[in-house]
Amino acid sequence: MALSCGIRTLKNVAVPLKRYPTIAACGLDCGLCPRYYTVGKSRCPGCCGPDFAEKHPTCSFITCCVKRKGLEACGECPEFPCAKFKSTEEYRAAEVSAYPPARKMLPNLHFIKKYGIARFVQQQRQRIRLLESMLGGFDDGRSRSFYCRAAALLGLRGVEGALRKAKR
């Protein structure tokens, strides 16, 4: 049985607590992470995706943001940035992390706060589409992290242009 981080019932229909597992409550860009595209046991299903609770049994961001407040990401919360972000060394380290999804945690949340989750997800889906095109057409089996990094950190126009040139 797949364990997610929670289900709510609406009109007798089970509905996941999160609609978008590709953006984590904490701002991690799950949909652009190499582990999201890994085949096998180490694959991460994204925030609150199937089997998420087995891989990540406790997450204070999910408890506060998703379960208590019913939000997709902390950037939707009127209290963001709360003391949790201001006092978390993890976020200071994330800004200089070599792990691409971590470098975008706070910028993602600030974008969501300013423009909303729908606009963020729209742009993220463009990045995911480009990443999946790179992985499907050019991955030699060892380039997944490189392509994830490009999709996460480079501008959309730059990635689209490079992909067009590569396809010629």
Give residue spans per PLM region:
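Short loop/turn segments that flank or connect secondary-structure elements
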Residues: 3-7, 75-167
